[in-house]
């Protein structure tokens, strides 16, 4: 049985698909054929030294190195999940030495058959519906007669664990005793010294410069923005060219705003911008401003419509005068 012959328009096998950007020997020296035909010729040419392994797909099956025949060790949970604190935690543990209400103490029960001196601590079974821990942290227990030693009941909470463990009365810290009392209505804390008001307006002021456009003249090399009059500056570096261009621009703007004229002569008409909307020539197309009475014109071009609006404006002014 003969194999079906492919048409010569199809790329012969084997070949690399277009878009492969890897290295292939002697590909850069082949000219005149497509990428597929060139790679097919190089793959089938015995004179071209190449690796026997294909680059696009592995020739051999992958080998599994991990051995699944051995039994896995039992899973051990993380230590942080089973203990209340992180290992090596040496910081404060609140209510560590306090007796929590509702938690029954351990009872030492001597068991028969065991040597004397060996006791086994067992927990007494709790009744049904009993809550071993209260829903809120209890206050530390105090000792009777200690309130007069410390002077104020609030100092028990202020000193914490050190107050009820130590038998000797604690010395009151000067300067802290009055903070536990609430101020009376006729007693107030000393007022704070007046602070300097923040002047918000100073952040909106521009710095005083020696030159009015000094910020614009400090050009940075590599700035690709627009600099007026810079296109006509040649033969100098960027920084000096920007300074010269800005000087020329400022001089041109000053002359434009203050035209040269003799005393008593009227300023030229080109100095003041025209504010006339209606013209006999009509407005230019793409004018997006509002033109009164133009909405009443139909089947007319923009120029004819604006001329018609100009005529209506003249008629209106003649009637009002």
From Swiss-Prot:
Pfam family, one: CMI2B-like
Keywords: Cell projection, Cilium, Cytoplasm, Cytoskeleton, Flagellum
Key word Aminoacyl-tRNA synthetase present: no
Keyword rRNA-binding (UniProt): no
Segments crossing the lipid bilayer: none
Record localization: Cytoplasm, Cytoskeleton, Flagellum axoneme
Cellular component GO terms held in the UniProt record: axonemal A tubule inner sheath; ciliary basal body; sperm flagellum
Biological process (GO), any one: flagellated sperm motility
Subunit structure: Microtubule inner protein component of sperm flagellar doublet microtubules.
Function: Microtubule inner protein (MIP) part of the dynein-decorated doublet microtubules (DMTs) in flagellum axoneme. Binds to the intra-tubulin interfaces.
Family, similarity comment: Belongs to the CIMIP2 family.
Protein's UniProt name: Ciliary microtubule inner protein 2A
Organism, scientific name: Rattus norvegicus
Lineage, top ranks: Eukaryota, Metazoa, Chordata, Craniata, Vertebrata
UniProt gene name: Cimip2a
């Amino acid at each position: 049985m003969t194999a079906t012959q492919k048409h010569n328009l199809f790329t012969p096998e084997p070949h690399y698909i277009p878009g492969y950007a890897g290295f292939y020997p002697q590909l850069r020296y082949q000219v005149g054929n497509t990428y597929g035909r060139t790679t097919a010729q190089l793959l089938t040419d015995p004179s071209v030294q190449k690796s026997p392994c294909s680059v696009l797909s592995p020739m051999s099956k992958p080998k599994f190195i991990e051995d699944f025949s051995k039994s896995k060790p039992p899973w051990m949970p993380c230590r942080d999940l089973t203990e209340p604190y992180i290992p090596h935690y040496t910081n404060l543990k609140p209510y560590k030495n306090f007796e929590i209400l509702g938690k029954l103490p351990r009872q030492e029960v001597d068991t028969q058959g065991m040597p004397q001196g060996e006791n086994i601590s067992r927990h007494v079974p709790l009744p049904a519906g009993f809550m071993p821990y209260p829903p809120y942290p209890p206050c530390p227990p105090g000792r009777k007669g200690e309130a007069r030693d410390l002077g104020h009941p609030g100092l028990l909470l202020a000193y914490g664990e050190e107050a009820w463990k130590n038998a000797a009365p604690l010395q009151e810290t000067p300067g802290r005793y009055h903070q536990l009392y609430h101020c009376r209505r006729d007693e107030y804390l000393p007022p704070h010294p007046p602070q300097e008001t923040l002047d918000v307006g100073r952040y909106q002021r521009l710095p005083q410069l020696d030159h009015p456009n000094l910020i614009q003249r400090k050009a940075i090399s590599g700035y690709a923005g627009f600099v007026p009059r810079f296109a006509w500056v040649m033969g100098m570096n960027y920084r000096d060219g920007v300074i010269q261009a800005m000087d020329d621009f400022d001089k041109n703007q000053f002359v434009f705003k203050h035209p040269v004229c003799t005393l008593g002569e009227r300023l030229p008409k080109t100095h003041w911008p025209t504010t006339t909307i209606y013209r006999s020539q009509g407005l230019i197309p793409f004018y997006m401003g509002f033109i009164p009475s133009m909405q009443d014109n139909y089947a007319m071009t923009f120029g004819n419509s604006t001329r018609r609006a100009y005529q209506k404006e003249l008629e209106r002014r003649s009637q009002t005068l």
